[in-house]
Every structure is written in structure tokens, then in C-alpha cells.
């Protein structure tokens, strides 16, 4: 069953977000990683949020092991554990 994951960083700016994306390539981390169906970054600068849709919790957790060192290096802090919800339905165009 698919999952919606919502991250609420405490200090996410466009510059930090863009740097984290650049560092994925530098670290050899594929984007999108296996199991990630959708990634959306939204909000106002300094208060950006990220939501994702994942195929499974195992795939999310595997990516998290690669992601957390990148976020730490860039200075992105999370306000706690992400919110995780089971998907009831997805409609795509």
C-alpha cells in the first residue's frame, strides 16, 4: 500500500533545498530513489515543506538512511518525525 509522507523542516530555504538536491548527485544518490512515486517541495522561502508518495515503508526507510547525512551537512533540521499516512486513493491525469 502506498504512503504519503509529510516533512516539516524548521528552517528550509530554497537555497538549502537546492543544495540538498545537488548533494544527492554528489553522493551518488539517485533521484527519484526506488519506491518514490512523487516528491513536492512547496511553501514560502524559509518555511518550505516536502510531501512525498512512496510505494512502501521499507523503501522510504532505505532512502532515509541516505538522506539524513545530506540534510545534516546542508544544515536542514527536521521538527520531528515525518507524518506518514496510508493512501486510500490516487488520481493522476
Predicted regions and their residues:
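Short S/T/G/P-rich N-terminal loop/turn motif that feeds into the first structured element of a domain
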Residues: 1-51, 55-69, 76-93
